[in-house]
From Swiss-Prot:
One of its GO terms (cellular component) is nucleus. One of its GO terms (biological process) is mRNA pseudouridine synthesis. This is Pseudouridylate synthase PUS7L. Belongs to the pseudouridine synthase TruD family. The lineage of its organism: Eukaryota, Metazoa, Chordata, Craniata, Vertebrata. The gene is PUS7L.
């Protein structure tokens, strides 16, 4: 595949730190030429087999009878007071024409079994509320509904009515449900054991789309949460109106229920009537048929493992594992992202899955070029950055001298490696952080998210490349039509992120709010990945400007880290020092101590030309007033400080003559023996091997 020109320009324009000549070569000729092994916080390679037992069946499996049972309220033994429920039946009026239509649950799945359920809820109110409170609650409900029926708006803040404090947790739960069942147009909220009743504004909103009878029944259905039950709205021949109902339900309750349209034949007219049916979403553990041992009440199960993947994008690997285990991608946690075209080993933790269940899918995932091992129970998830670094074993093939270089190739290679080993390399974020798309890079999506341009971010995400393949044909169709449902039918199953966004857009619509919900279909780590891509791009440009402007000298206004032992990006502000004029003149600090801020709300800028450069860039990108928080997507970007130079550790290398290279492929005459370079080294967390190699070779890799 032809390389992306913009991709090359971005990194070719960044300056180097060392002055050696370098050489040409090819990396990642195959995934086995680029092996990445994560180093955990204890300094251990994660591909080493752990000696401790993988898991103990006896500690994980529980018999169903051993589960603690929730205490249930004995509704049958509650005292009943007849006559207090009569007002409820006057609150809802039906027209004669609606009597034959059964909106709400299907007969076999009806929420209200005769009158028993309604009476039971009313009895709970009568039993727990004194007569005065019960009467005041009924009056409050009548007042709210009368105002809505008379089209009178509720002035100011919505009114509320306090039931009072209910200390018993079970009684509070029963009262919450009883009030919502009796008065679906009200909602209840808890405040320190107090139950407060308010108007249900979503009920009123739904009444603008459907009859009040349907709204009343729908909210009763929703509150009852009866497993395997369905709710059906009245037949509707207006497609746009049905679409509005779909979007309302999915926008407000999409995490709980799903909607579908079904055709029903109208016998009198001979035309099909279409109904919108709602049903509760299947729980993840039921989709994956997870055993009872994974649903221990009050205890979240975490299973750690080492993931080996080959030539596979990390997010694609997580999506595949999630499907096989019946969980969602956000249930996986990891310490860092890994390359696609490589063989990588990394630590991961998945929640709500036992070690035994993970071990059961080993054979299935091998077909996807993945393996899992070192499977064991742990107490918590991983967080980004929770690693010491990565070990790399790399083969660089097709070694050649730079153009017009007459020196010996072997000498050039040794000179370059020793130079970087001694002086270090510029600690740029690697190109894999930004994607290799010709038209759109991940940092452009991140900038749109920072500017709260959600729809633009979606369109950038789904912008096709100039390639004729199923993925890009699907993306092209979406940009032309904004038809999420049609695009889903075209998008290949393995494109997990694209399909997640499209499914959400189908549910919520291609609106600003729908696009926000679509971004929420991706795990938090994926959402913030795009924002980090933008802040990483700016940091790369900043460090290049810093070195071009001041070189290796530490000058007034630079920021330096005072703690030599910190080897990650989590420098506290207390460890960051602003270099004074006197300190700069006295050469008190070395260049390897200089740090630059990665954009965020909790950083300080250098007090020299570099600081002004940051402000100019923010102005250029329309972020002068950006607070680096995107509350609509629950993204907070505090920022951090990153050292401008890094050194490879435990570096070793070997030149290897490879007589087979090119001979088999071209059969041409070889004037000199082809060389390959085997190089191994360790890098700190958030450092990139491709960046280190670029400094060594002085050539794009």
């Amino acid at each position: 595949m032809e390389e992306d020109t913009d991709y090359r320009i971005r990194f070719s324009s960044l300056c180097f730190f060392n002055d050696h000549v370098g050489f040409h070569g090819t990396i990642k000729s195959s995934p086995s030429d680029f092996i990445v092994i994560e180093i955990d916080e204890q300094g251990q390679l994660v591909n080493k087999t752990i000696d401790e037992p993988i898991f103990k069946i006896s500690e994980i499996q529980l018999e169903p009878n051993n589960f603690p049972k929730k205490p249930k309220l004995d509704l049958q033994n509650l005292s009943l007071e007849d006559g207090r429920n009569q007002e409820v039946h006057t609150l809802i009026k039906y027209t004669d024409g609606d009597q034959n239509h059964q909106s709400g649950s299907e007969k076999e799945d009806t929420i209200v079994d005769g009158t028993s359920k309604c009476e039971e809820k009313a009895d709970v109110l009568s039993s727990f509320l004194d007569e005065k409170t019960h009467e005041l609650l009924n009056n409050f409900a009548c007042d709210v509904r009368e105002k809505w029926l008379s089209k009178t708006e509720l002035i100011g803040l919505p009114p509320e009515f306090s039931i009072g404090r209910i200390l018993d947790k079970n009684q509070r739960a029963s009262l919450h449900s009883a009030i919502r069942q009796k008065f679906p147009f009200l909602v209840t909220v808890g405040k320190n054991s107090e139950i407060v009743v308010k108007p249900n504004l979503e009920y009123k909103e739904l009444c603008h789309l459907v009859s009040e009878e349907e709204a009343f029944d729908f909210f009763k259905y929703l509150d009852a949460k009866k497993e395997n039950s369905k709710f059906t709205f009245k037949p509707d021949t207006n497609k746009d109106h049905r679409k509005a109902v779909h979007h309302f339900v999915n926008k407000k309750f999409g995490n709980l229920v799903e909607t579908k349209s079904f055709s029903k034949m109208n016998c009198s007219a001979g035309n099909p009537n279409v109904v919108v049916t709602v049903r509760f979403r299947e729980k993840a553990h039921k989709r994956g048929k997870r055993p009872l041992s994974e649903c221990q009440e009050g205890k979240v199960i975490y299973t750690a493992f080492t993931l080996r993947k080959e030539n596979l994008e990390m997010f694609e690997a997580i999506g595949f594992l999630a499907i096989k285990l019946g969980v969602i991608p956000s249930d996986f946690s990891y310490a860092g992202l890994k390359d696609k075209k490589a063989i990588t080993y990394q630590a991961m933790v998945v929640r709500k899955v036992t070690p035994e269940r993970l071990k059961n899918i080993e054979k299935e995932i091998e077909k996807k070029r993945m393996n899992v091992f070192n499977i064991r129970s742990v107490d918590d998830s991983l967080r980004l950055g929770q690693l010491k670094g990565n070990h790399f074993d790399i083969v660089i093939r097709n070694l050649k001298k730079q153009i017009n270089d007459s020196a010996n190739l072997r000498e050039r290679i040794m000179e370059a490696i020793e130079n970087v080993k001694k002086k270090g390399f510029v600690n740029y974020y690697g190109p894999q952080r930004f994607g290799k798309g010709r038209k759109v890079h991940t940092d452009q999506i991140g900038l749109a998210l920072l500017k709260n341009e959600m729809m633009k971010a979606i369109k950038l995400f789904l912008t096709p490349e100039d390639l004729d393949d199923p993925v890009n044909r699907a993306k092209k169709y979406f940009l032309q039509t904004e038809d999420a449902k049609g695009t889903l039918s075209l998008m290949p199953e393995f494109k997990v992120r694209e399909r997640a966004l499209l499914e959400a857009l189908h549910r919520f619509g291609m609106t600003e709010e729908g696009c926000i919900q679509a971004w929420f279909s991706l795990p938090h780590s994926m959402r913030i990945f795009y924002v980090h891509a933008y802040t990483s791009k700016i940091w790369n440009e900043a460090v290049s400007y810093r070195l071009e402007t001041y070189g290796a000298r530490v000058v007034q206004g630079d920021l330096v880290c005072l703690d030599e032992d910190i080897d990650d990006e989590n420098f506290p502000n207390s460890k960051i020092h602003l270099v004074t004029e006197e300190e700069g003149s006295a050469n008190m600090y070395a260049i390897h101590q200089v740090v630059l801020p990665v954009l965020g709300y909790n950083i300080q800028y250098p007090k020299n030309k570099v600081g002004q450069w940051y402000h100019d860039i923010l102005s250029r990108d329309g972020l002068q007033t950006c607070r680096f928080k995107v509350p609509t997507l629950k993204l907070n970007i505090p920022g951090c400080y990153r050292q401008i130079l890094k050194h490879p550790c435990n570096l070793s290398y070997q030149l290897m003559e490879d007589h087979d290279i090119d001979v088999k492929t071209k059969g041409s005459h070889i004037d000199e023996t082809a060389l390959s370079l085997l190089i191994s080294f360790d890098l700190d967390a958030s450092c990139y091997a491709t960046v280190c190699l670029k400094e060594i070779m002085k050539h794009d890799v």
